[in-house]
Amino acid sequence: MAGLVKLSCLVLACMIVAGPIATNAALSCGTVSGNLAACIGYLTQNGPLPRGCCTGVTNLNNMARTTPDRQQACRCLVGAANAFPTLNAARAAGLPKACGVNIPYKISKSTNCNSVR
């Protein structure tokens, strides 16, 4: 039940962050959070890294091919990171590498998504 509440908060935070952003991005924060839902325990409770988490990270990376999409995904991730006070910052920053995925920015609460290309 607590996981469902956290996921709901993540989705809500993503929608709030993405609401005022007008871009040409095809990615929504709902898509981003849906792909990363399996990562919540790993990022907030120091649980094991589930295979489904890395599948979501890979899928998200494959969807974010344009600069607007990468910037939008970044904004969603920053919003989600800020919504979780128990987020393990080191695990969040290292998540792409742990999943064997290379993204052009660091996942953190303070990433400048406008600089993402």
Swiss-Prot record:
List GO BP terms, alphabetically: lipid transport
- Mind telling me which Pfam families this protein's record contains? Tryp_alpha_amyl (PF00234)
Q: Which ranges form a coiled coil?
A: none
Entry keywords, A to Z: Disulfide bond, Lipid-binding, Signal, Transport
- Where are the disulfide bridges? 29-76, 39-53, 54-99, 74-113
User: What residue range is the signal peptide?
Assistant: 1-25
One term of GO molecular function: lipid binding
Domain of life where this protein originates: Eukaryota
User: Do the record's keywords include Hydrolase?
Assistant: no
- Family to which the UniProt record says this protein belongs: Belongs to the plant LTP family.
Report the function annotation for this chain.
Plant non-specific lipid-transfer proteins transfer phospholipids as well as galactolipids across membranes. May play a role in wax or cutin deposition in the cell walls of expanding epidermal cells and certain secretory tissues.
Protein name (Swiss-Prot/TrEMBL): Non-specific lipid-transfer protein 1
Q: Which organism is it from?
A: Brassica napus
Q: Corresponding gene? A: LTP1
